[in-house]
Amino acid sequence: MNITLQVRARLGLILLVISSICVAGPPAETQYRITAPDREGIGKFYMGRQISYVMGHQGASWLERGSRRVEERTDLLIASLPLEADFVVADIGAGTGYFSFPVATRVPQGRVLAVDIQPEMLEIISSRIAQSGTTNVEPLLGGVQSPNLAINSIDLAFIVDAYHEFSHPFEMGQGLFEALKPGGQLVLIEYRGEDASVPIKRLHKMTAQQAGKEMRALGFTGPDMLDVLPQQHILIFTKPGE
């Protein structure tokens, strides 16, 4: 074989190796394990955690229950979000917009993208926008594998009591990491999995250790943890950058 053919053969082998790496998918520790579902979970495991069932739009009234502000101190939650007036914020798993609208008052020169995978929830948000005249909340249909947000387009994303339901947490996490600007932050609010006294089903809670493991696998740093709420962690993760 002459030198030219040898070079071409080696280049072909290199390209084949690169190609196989590119299509190999996520690293081994972020692969999913599938088993039979049970009463609480879908039978899909991610980094040792079983993913819970999704609460559908039929549960919208529970999200808006009158006791929620006192039970969860949602006022403290909103006040704890590290926001600036001109931020573009994504409320992931926005549901009825329970948090989207009060957060919008904290970013008067910015906007809140209320992202949900259920069109019925977005219809509720659209109705609330029309009734209230709010101009800086935008409903956005997300997917189970992507939040459908542009790259480097948001300053902060927050997820309240929903991340544990994501059927594709690795892919969704990648999408959020890419959507955040350098230095942007992801705020994860989850019921404390370490606390047996929190009256929530096991798979609807998460420990700070588990959340940190999953977010760091995506490239985030953190978490900075604020335990100012009666039942939930506030976990702040940062995308490296400015």
Question: Model regions: which residues?
Answer:
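Bacterial N-terminal signal peptides that target proteins for export
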Residues: 2-13
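Class I SAM-dependent transferase core
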Residues: 26-84, 88
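Class I SAM-dependent methyltransferase SAM/SAH-binding core
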Residues: 90, 94-146
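A short acidic, Gly/Pro-enriched loop at the edge of an enzyme's catalytic core
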Residues: 147-156
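A short SAM/SAH-binding and catalytic strip from SAM-dependent methyltransferases
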Residues: 155-170
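A short glycine-rich, Lys/Arg-flanked "PGG" loop and its adjoining helix->strand segment in the class I
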Residues: 170-185
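Conserved class I S-adenosyl-L-methionine
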Residues: 185-212
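Core SAM-dependent methyltransferase catalytic element
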Residues: 218, 224-242
